[in-house]
Design a protein with these regions (language model features):
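Short, acidic Ser/Thr/Gly-rich low-complexity loop/linker segments typical of extracellular
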Residues: 55-75
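Extended low-complexity, serine/threonine- and proline-enriched intrinsically disordered segments
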Residues: 29-59
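Extended beta-strand/loop cores of jelly-roll/beta-sandwich
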Residues: 227-229, 323-421
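Aromatic- and Gly/Pro-enriched helix-to-coil junctions and flexible linker segments
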Residues: 1-4, 18, 33, 85-87, ...
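Short, surface-exposed beta-strand/beta-hairpin micro-motifs centered on an aromatic residue
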Residues: 75-81, 406-407
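Short amphipathic, basic-aromatic surface patches that mediate peripheral association
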Residues: 15-27, 168
C-alpha cells in the first residue's frame, strides 16, 4: 500500500459521510446538526489530572482545548482539515451551538492523511453508503476560530466574565442562600468521594463561584457509563442553569457569545483549569513537560504553547437587567388541602385539616416493567395556588379548584420508565 503520509504538511483531512448515521445521533431529526465543534487535549502528567480533582469537580480527566468549528452540509456530510499528529475530538452542535452528543474518545490524523467515517459512532462493521454527498469533491474547510484562537478552556477566562457582566449584582453577598458568583474567593473545604488519591494536596483549587455554579449543571462526569450516551442525554438545555436563563431569570438576558461560552463549558465537562501552570502541582511536572516537548518535536506534533491563555478580563461592568412590573396574582388561600409531612401536627390556619390523608389510600406504586416502578400520589379535591413568584413565566399565581381527586406521578418520568411504554 503506498504511503499516504506527506511529512511536509501540518494538517490531515477528515471526511464525514453522514453525521446522522450510527447510534451516536440515533433519533435526532435531520437538519438539526449545524456545525461540528473541534477540540483537542492537553494530556495530564502524573498528579495533574484524572481522579485527583485537579482540573475540575468530577471532571474532565485532561485539559480540553477548543480549536474551533466547521460547517455541516444539509445532508449531514462534512470535509475539513485538522491539525496533524494531534488528538482530536468532535461534538455535533445544534443551531444554538450546544452539543447533541459527547465524544469521549479521540482520533489522530497523520500529515496529509485523509480519515473518513460513515457517521457518529457507527458500528465498525458498517460500510459506506454508495451515494454522492454534498461535501464530496469540495475543498476541505479550514477550522473556524471560536471566539479567538485555539486555547485551553478555563472557567476564569471564559465563564467568570459572563458572571461578572450579568450575575454578580445579585450573587455577590455571602450572608444569604444564593449562589456566590464573584470570582474573588477560593474554597477551602473541598473533599472528594471518588476513588483514588484525591486530596487537597492535588485537587480542589477552585473558586467559590465555580463550586456554586457547578451545582446547576449536568454532564457525564469523570467516571460516567462507558456505554454510548443517549443523544441529548447531557445536552446543555438539560441543566438547571440553562433552564433558568431560558425562563427569563429575573429578566437577565445574556448575549449570544456568553450563552455559547456557558454551553461549551457544560459540553466540555465543566472544567475549571485550562492550563497546567494554574494547577497546584505544576512545579512537580518539570521533567514530564520537558520530555513532552522533546517528543512533540521528535514525532512531528504541531508546536503549541499549551500554557498560553489571554490575560484575565478586568474592569467588566455589571449590566443591571430591567425589572418590569409584574402581576404576582393570588398570594394566600385558606384551607390548603395537601399533605405536609413536616407539619407536626398538621395544622392549616385555625383547625386541623388534611384532605389528602382523609382520602385514605393516597399513595400507590405500580410495577410497569420488571424492576421498573412508578410511584403515584393522589391529589384531593379542593383549591390550591398554581404558579410561583420565583420566575416570570410562573406568574401570576392563580387560585385553581380541583373538582374531584386524581392520581399523578410523584416524580418526573425517567428515561427508563419511558422506555417501558
Amino acid at each position: 500500500i503506498p504511503d499516504q503520509v506527506k511529512p511536509g504538511l501540518t494538517t490531515g483531512t477528515v471526511f464525514l459521510q453522514d453525521v446522522y448515521a450510527g447510534d451516536g445521533l440515533k433519533g435526532i431529526p435531520r437538519g438539526t446538526v449545524k456545525k461540528l465543534r473541534v477540540g483537542t487535549y492537553d494530556f495530564s502528567p502524573w498528579r495533574q489530572g484524572g481522579l485527583l480533582g485537579t482540573i475540575g469537580m468530577d471532571g474532565p480527566w485532561d485539559i480540553k482545548r477548543i480549536i474551533g468549528e466547521v460547517d455541516v452540509e444539509e445532508d449531514g456530510s462534512a470535509i475539513f482539515q485538522v491539525p496533524a499528529n494531534t488528538p482530536v475530538f468532535i461534538q455535533p452542535l445544534d443551531a444554538e451551538g450546544k452539543a447533541l452528543q459527547i465524544m469521549r474518545s479521540w482520533f489522530t490524523a497523520m500529515p496529509g492523511e485523509v480519515l473518513s467515517c460513515i457517521g457518529c459512532h457507527e458500528d465498525r462493521n458498517m460500510v459506506a453508503i454508495p451515494r454522492k454527498v454534498k461535501a464530496f469533491g469540495k475543498v476541505p474547510q479550514k477550522i473556524q476560530e471560536w471566539q479567538g484562537k485555539e486555547r485551553g478552556f478555563s472557567y476564569r477566562h471564559e465563564v467568570q466574565p459572563v458572571l461578572d457582566r450579568y450575575c454578580v449584582g445579585c450573587h455577590s453577598r455571602e450572608d444569604n442562600s444564593r449562589p456566590y458568583l464573584k470570582g474573588d474567593k477560593w474554597i477551602t473545604d473541598w473533599t472528594s468521594q471518588i476513588s483514588g488519591s484525591a486530596s487537597t494536596e492535588y485537587g480542589g483549587h477552585f473558586t467559590r463561584s465555580y463550586a456554586d455554579l457547578h451545582r446547576y449543571v449536568r454532564r457525564p462526569g469523570i467516571e460516567s457509563d462507558m456505554h454510548m450516551l443517549t443523544p441529548m442525554d447531557v445536552h446543555a438545555d438539560q441543566t438547571e442553569l440553562m433552564q433558568l436563563l431560558a425562563k427569563g431569570h429575573y429578566n437577565v438576558k445574556l448575549d449570544s457569545a456568553s450563552m455559547l461560552r456557558l454551553a461549551c463549558w457544560i459540553d466540555f465537562n465543566a472544567p475549571f483549569h485550562g492550563r497546567r501552570k494554574d494547577i497546584s502541582t505544576y512545579d512537580r511536572t518539570e521533567n514530564s513537560r520537558r520530555l513532552r516537548e522533546l517528543y512533540r518535536e521528535m514525532f512531528g506534533a504541531p508546536a503549541h504553547d499549551m500554557e498560553w491563555l489571554p490575560e484575565l478580563p478586568t474592569g467588566i461592568a455589571y449590566e443591571k437587567p430591567d425589572r418590569p412590573m409584574v402581576n404576582i396574582g393570588d398570594t394566600a388561600l385558606k384551607g390548603w388541602p395537601l399533605y405536609d409531612p413536616e407539619a407536626k401536627p398538621y395544622v392549616a390556619w385555625s383547625k386541623p385539616q388534611n384532605l389528602q390523608i382523609a382520602l385514605g389510600n393516597f399513595q400507590m406504586t405500580i410495577e410497569i416493567a420488571p424492576g421498573v416502578e412508578l410511584r403515584m400520589i393522589k391529589v384531593p379535591a379542593g383549591s390550591f395556588i398554581m404558579g410561583s413568584t420565583r420566575q416570570p413565566d410562573e406568574m401570576p399565581q392563580t387560585a385553581v379548584t380541583i373538582d374531584k381527586p386524581f392520581w399523578i406521578g410523584q416524580f418526573e418520568i425517567t428515561n427508563r420508565q419511558f422506555r417501558a411504554f
